[in-house]
Amino acid sequence: MKVIFNADDFGLTRGVNDGIVHAHLDGVVRSTTMMVGMPAEAHAVELANHLPELKVGLHLRFTAGRPLTEEQNLVGRDGDFTPYGQFWHRRDYDPIAIHNEAVAQVEYFLALGLNLSHIDSHHHAHTHPQFEPVIYDIARTYQVPLRSTGLAGEEEFGCRYHFTDHFYDKRVGHDSLIQHLLTLKEHYDVVEVMCHPAIVDTALEACSGYAKQRELELAILTSDELKLSLRKHDIEVTDYSELIFAPLHSCV
């Protein structure tokens, strides 16, 4: 089995960026997804330009910050995106507004000069029932993989692919992660593990309730123990290009 450790939130803060780079250079992270239009975006681009082996995708925003478009259907009275707590209860989203904002973010990303590796979203927003079909079509248009939460699978990628958010919050731990991967190994060719490594800074503490845990993630993702365990169990670290170039019926 192969595993993709994808680090979310690239571009959120400089501490997040530095943590992701550390997890890439000294750990198992080979893929990340960037939030455009966020405070540390320029810093993230500068870092990415010096890391040719780090695959960078787009972390679509629909629950954080302000949109790149003027689509009023996506925001509250303050002009910010609908907060996370309210986002999932809404069923009045306009698919045209969703499409326009998502395309604007993709085009903004491409204008930065980066190669688009794949697409996912902050807070899994693309899995909202009104967002899912729109974002899926956009991913197909740009011919890049979309983080799977049941929409795309073996027929889409040509292999048995599975996404897991197990490595998060109270479940962050070496033993828990390895045991989880071993249960998946019997059924899948490629598993994507969502992760959030970071070096906590004041900006992160101010904007996210998930802060200190990110440093624990970073410690595990860069540990010799994890690298040894993956080799012991014949689990190979890869990146999203594994899905792009997957031959029919097999990724191994």
UniProtKB/Swiss-Prot annotation:
Required co-factors: Mg(2+)
Matches recorded under InterPro entries: COD_ChbG_bac, Glyco_hydro/deAcase_b/a-brl, YdjC-like
Pfam families in alphabetical order: YdjC
Entry annotated with the keyword Metal-binding: yes
Organism expressing this protein natively: Vibrio vulnificus (strain CMCP6)
Positions annotated to bind Mg(2+): H59, H122
Gene3D superfamilies: Glycoside hydrolase/deacetylase (3.20.20.370)
Protein name: Carbohydrate deacetylase
